[in-house]
Amino acid sequence: MKCCNGAESAKVDGDPAPVPSESDPGTDSRPMHCVVGGAHAFILRISSFFGLAPLRFESRSNGFTVGISNAMCIYSYILVTVLVICTIFGLVAEINVGVDLSVRMSSRMSQFVSTCDVLVVVITAGAGVYGAPKRMRNMLKFMESIASVDTSIGAHYSLATERKLCAILVAILLFFSVLITDDFCFYALQAKKIDRQWDIVTNYIGFYLLWYVVMILELQFAFTALSVRARFQAVNDALALTARHISVPLEKAKEPTPLNIFAIRVAAESRRCANNVSLLVDSMPGKEHAVIIRNAVSGEPKLIVPPCEAIRRLACLHGALCNVVHRIGNSYGLPLIVILISTLLHLIVTPYFLIMEIMVSSHRIHFLVLQFLWCVTHVLRMFVVVEPCHYTINAGKRTEALVCRLMTSTPSTGMLPSRLELFSRQLMLQSVSYTPLGMCTLDRPLVASVLGAVTTYLVILIQFQRYGE
């Protein structure tokens, strides 16, 4: 979901596009800018407002030029610090009221559970915002690799896809806003019975605003991961096209996937070009770009280099994308771990309140529906983080399968078998997976583990509650 830096995407004819590395001394000297448009600019604008993307936006004819802004960094720090302080003071004030007057903490156990609920939101938002400047700098660097893929395999742009993504993002934010508003109003109305409605407003306003920061952070990561997954899909499609070119059809021919399938519209801001050139346009001028595929007049993708050279370049692009995956994992490492812990705790806390409400039989239907919607929201939050990573891992497995079938189907003479052998060794050494801080792998088995842990802790909490009564 991020942008690339202002360097050329490739250099010498016949060579693959270079991949910037953290050890490259020239990487840091490049101007940290890029041009974004459409839904990409939309998610960045929202992230910037909530302190998760401290960028400056300069309007251009084809989108916005974005770069790190010191003023926005200060704004982000001040925003999250004020919200965290307000939330902590509100939590302490609510605890001091006591269980008799509190509408959210009616017992000692609910005091403990609600405190955990508030603190995990505070920690998640803090980890996301305080680490945002470094994360954005890393994004601006490694997205040059994304740009090199777009250039090499004849990427094309879909306006309809971008509109769909914008609609999905708006729908998610509207649903969450309605849920937050309903939750806030419910507790305010409950507090009105004992003339404490304004106490609820002042004590919890920071908490609810921090919830937006958490949600935007999760959407930001999902957007980024899905954009990389789209490039893996495109590399796999190019690999299948190469196989068909040498009369080894591995898959049924299908329509090429738009590389902005998740509305990633990126353009590089070159130091040597007066105008910005869209990296999603097929006709890139000049010989310095390591183009592998171009779209013919009929719209069909066409291989423009020999199959052996195409395999070599695709291996380089695949390696570049693997490096991008690892950099994303490093950039989002701490926030992802905190998000997973936060989701685990919320999946324990919310069903706990729901079950307790059912057990006391107070017949507050509104509260039951509200807690059920929060349970659904937390499950969806977990899938928002895990599913893009799962799809990316599957794309990596598809690459392995394609290379394996190519190795067993191609003739044993010439350079092609050796290129495929090198590609297969690269796949063995470079895994496609998100492992934040090396603590876990973001994949569907993690969902099963979380749900198992939730069940175990819910049983323990309910037993403690019954014992206390």
What positions do the PLM features span?
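Membrane-embedded alpha-helical segments and the immediately adjacent membrane-proximal loops
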Residues: 2-394, 428-469
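Membrane-cytosol interface motif
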Residues: 151-154, 244, 399-409
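Juxtamembrane non-transmembrane "cap" segments at the membrane-aqueous interface
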Residues: 403-424
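A generic structural signal for well-ordered alpha-helical surface patches
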Residues: 390, 394-397, 401-404, 418, ...
